[in-house]
């Protein structure tokens, strides 16, 4: 597989906030999609603290999630999306 990761700059239309959606391959069967709030130049405000992360086990699942988040962050209110994914994620121990 030639693709190692995906990266998209997103400007939210309702709030005009900027985000970066990044998907990377962490391991052979582990992909991580992270959403960062960004500044005017689309540089993440906090590199080590994304708004949320979602793990995937297959490349197809990771790419689909990346595309879905990119579209949703463009059109929907970001707080609603962030809350949805934080509630779905298991609590750290």
Walk through the language-model features, giving the residues of each:
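Generic signature of intrinsically disordered, low-complexity, basic-rich segments
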Residues: 17-19, 29, 52, 67, ...
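Generic detector of bulky aromatic hydrophobic side chains
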Residues: 33, 55, 76-78
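Short arginine-rich
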Residues: 67-82
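Intrinsic-disorder/low-complexity coil detector
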Residues: 13, 43, 49, 58, ...
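Short intrinsically disordered, low-complexity segments
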Residues: 37-38, 66, 92
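A short, exposed loop/beta-hairpin motif centered on an aromatic-Gly-Thr core
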Residues: 41-64, 68-69
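Short N-terminal "domain-start" leader segments
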Residues: 1-35, 39
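Intrinsically disordered, low-complexity charged/polar segments
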Residues: 81-93
């Amino acid at each position: 597989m030639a693709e190692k990761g995906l990266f998209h700059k997103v400007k939210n239309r309702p709030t005009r906030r900027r985000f970066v959606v990044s998907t990377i391959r962490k391991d052979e069967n582990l992909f991580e999609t992270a959403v960062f709030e960004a500044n005017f130049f689309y540089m993440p405000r906090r590199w080590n603290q994304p708004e949320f992360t979602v793990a995937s086990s297959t490349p197809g699942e990771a790419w689909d999630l990346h595309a879905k988040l990119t579209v949703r962050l463009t059109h929907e209110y970001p707080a609603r999306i962030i809350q949805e994914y934080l509630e779905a994620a298991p609590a750290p121990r």
